[in-house]
């Protein structure tokens, strides 16, 4: 077995089968001592391989062969002249070191480029041009009949399970619905549409559905993908003349999960294919789960017929977790990593990182790594020092009176209206929002917040926080207002 054969086995584990067959299998790698030449068939193919898979190829060859090596990327098939880019990786070379470019011409003075063969199967002008672009000939075409491993979609990640998803008021409805469809797919909430900002746990919930459904029914056919991969699969099925297989695979799923569905908006061919796929699955009682960064009606360029179908089932939101949930997320994450995190440090990070869960966990990792490297406990002082440029710690904390002023200006009412006894909706709702913001953005206790709003009882503040949290799940207008106010006050 050659070094490259060993590498292929490792690379295959890191890619979807379809991606592996489309991009990695067609290339040829020749080894001459420490020199590895990667033949990529044409310039476009070479650039794509190098930009998307270059680091994976380099690290895998280093793992199988050692660090002292040279990699050449050729834009030709395995013969004749070569135009190559050379990557040198020695014992002291940085993994992400700058590549040097070397032009080699080993075919005397000729610069003739061999034309790729065009499949006799296709009479389509578009397909022929795509063949010329990608450099595929008939021998490279992959069909389900020729290869049983031909597949679509993306692998589910085992780490995304319901047990590792921290539940709070901002996501409990979405989590409950996700659990229901994983146990009884196609029965309730079909489709299940989960929307919310980036990094708030939509992908986690979606993959948790797939992983749990597989535990409940190991024989279920579950396809997980995102809109980018769905588009790639569709385009590749056209290029490889295998649309029937694309349709057969996607329309035979028991559970179809598509992340970031908003990106199919404006892509007419893909949107139409998805429309028919949706109808086929829905009519057969198969479960569909979709995520998006926006409510269906707010996705610009999305066809009305798709918007209406997304409304067939249940639409739920995931919002930024409140302070208590953010603290719980940090403590659980630290525990999962086998690290001790003081409650006060978790509270400090949670109070200062309010963008999304992804950045919250990133801040935690930075604190834990810094403290471990410096052989110190992860104290507030350590967090303050290493996160200063990330969270832009302000010397003055947000004050309740500032929140009241911003909210009053936003809703065009007076600050004294917020502290008054008026109960009209145009006053009561902004007051509840201001209380909820005060609870999230300040360290004041419930009684202190109530006192700042005209001497109200702490139970009134609790009711306001719960009411606004619930409304943010179902009312996009209030949810958008809240996020906008949150950003204004946090600046």
Curated annotation (Swiss-Prot):
Entry superkingdom: Bacteria
GO molecular function: ATP binding; ATP hydrolysis activity; DNA replication origin binding; lipid binding
Key words of the record: ATP-binding, Cytoplasm, DNA replication, DNA-binding, Lipid-binding, Nucleotide-binding
Region (Domain II) location: 69-154
Subcellular location per the Swiss-Prot or TrEMBL entry: Cytoplasm
HAMAP family referenced in this protein's UniProt entry, alphabetically: DnaA_bact
Complexes and interactors: Oligomerizes as a right-handed, spiral filament on DNA at oriC.
Name listed for the protein in its UniProt record: Chromosomal replication initiator protein DnaA
The species this protein was found in: Francisella tularensis subsp. tularensis (strain WY96-3418)
Upper lineage: Bacteria, Pseudomonadati, Pseudomonadota, Gammaproteobacteria, Thiotrichales
Gene name of the encoded protein: dnaA
